Amino acid sequence: MSLAKDNIWKLLAPLVVMGVMFLIPVPDGMPPQAWHYFAVFVAMIVGMILEPIPATAISFIAVTICVIGSNYLLFDAKELADPAFNAQKQALKWGLAGFSSTTVWLVFGAFIFALGYEVSGLGRRIALFLVKFMGKRTLTLGYAIVIIDILLAPFTPSNTARTGGTVFPVIKNLPPLFKSFPNDPSARRIGGYLMWMMVISTSLSSSMFVTGAAPNVLGLEFVSKIAGIQISWLQWFLCFLPVGVILLIIAPWLSYVLYKPEITHSEEVATWAGDELKTMGALTRREWTLIGLVLLSLGLWVFGSEVINATAVGLLAVSLMLALHVVPWKDITRYNSAWNTLVNLATLVVMANGLTRSGFIDWFAGTMSTHLEGFSPNATVIVLVLVFYFAHYLFASLSAHTATMLPVILAVGKGIPGVPMEQLCILLVLSIGIMGCLTPYATGPGVIIYGCGYVKSKDYWRLGAIFGVIYISMLLLVGWPILAMWN
């Protein structure tokens, strides 16, 4: 009975939040539809945190509400007054746009890669190898995950392809070796910690190198066009290096303290892993085929970006896995995590886009410029960086966030006399990768990691908030002073 009451409370909370926001007068200068849309968006976030029903269902319902209520949530009076404007047709087109997102399908491809590792047995083999040599202590496994991701980052300009398509499929095979399973109390034995370490690794590696994540390059384009400032690959790396090294050392250990796994040492498991490797014998045809596809995909992701899109590489890999009988189609149709994540990310991308479509982002930029009048240059830098960073709670993609918010923040900073624009620009672009730890939907790998079921929603949000604050604090308190000395 108590469980039912608790679930009813969780179900009502988002509706109450939305209702209260609807009753609050629209802020000065904000389009009415933007405020009403923002109310639905906030209610969706509350629902995804409390999870009275699955998070994917929450985001799906939110998109449906916005499509049906588009006259009050998306479109302004001028659009609606145009006889040639078909509101319902445009709303439905908007609502389904997320399913054509390249990021969404790249994430889906990464999930199928993970399935390939599982079905072929290659993932289990690599996992056993890691456990044999580094599995005596859980903490060393955590550091191994971070190091592997960072070593791949300079050559893989997509964190979803790198962490989601290369690292995750391997690490996903480790927890079951320790009797730790998803969506089960045993997830905390070791699975939850290892999955969170991938969140740590992808956020650090994405900020360490310009080529660590696609939105980094997009950010540099905006910096060049709007601020007229050029940032080189080496300059980026050296600016983040002091912060990155410190976080690389402390983040796995701090995760171990804050989200401590039940299994910390296991000499027996390391010995057992060696025996299991002997039992598995030589690599099978399926495993060799998958290795070839992995190397092909990595090669195209690293060297073929000018010829073939990263998402197309992922779809090519899936097609070849099907054609070469690495993964049967029936297994893909039964792979609930992949389809669930596809719908979840597609709907979140749409909802984030709606903030711009409704006029909320434009109002936000204008209001922020007004409120920053009279601030000192350094205070302005801090405020702009923090606003840009924590605004990522509103976005389901680093690329979408960068494309939407970075031009706004740069324009605001450029318009205020005395602001050190080079320092501001570098701090803004360096923060793009590390903000990927904030929420389960913050970046492609995060969606994949959360979708596998080892880290509960409340734990993800709690850890994301803690590490999000630590990351940005280190960037401002350590990275900025060093950057100021160099300049």
Curated annotation (Swiss-Prot):
CDD domains cross-referenced by the UniProt entry: ArsB_NhaD_permease (cd00625)
GO CC list: plasma membrane
Entry's localization field: Cell inner membrane
A single MF term (Gene Ontology): antiporter activity
Membrane topology: Multi-pass membrane protein
Pfam families linked to this entry: Na_sulph_symp
Cystine pairs: none
InterPro entries to which the protein is assigned, alphabetical: CitT-rel, SLC13A/DASS
Presence of the UniProt keyword Lipid metabolism in the record: no
Keywords: Antiport, Cell inner membrane, Cell membrane, Membrane, Transmembrane, Transmembrane helix, Transport
Transmembrane residue ranges: 11-31, 60-80, 95-115, 138-158, 190-210, 214-234, 237-257, 288-308, 309-329, 345-365, 379-399, 401-421, 424-444, 463-483
Family: Belongs to the SLC13A/DASS transporter (TC 2.A.47) family. DIT1 subfamily.
Function, as annotated: Responsible for the uptake of citrate in exchange with the efflux of succinate, fumarate or tartrate. Has a relatively broad specificity for C(4)-dicarboxylates and tricarboxylates.
Protein name, as recorded: Citrate/succinate antiporter
Gene: citT
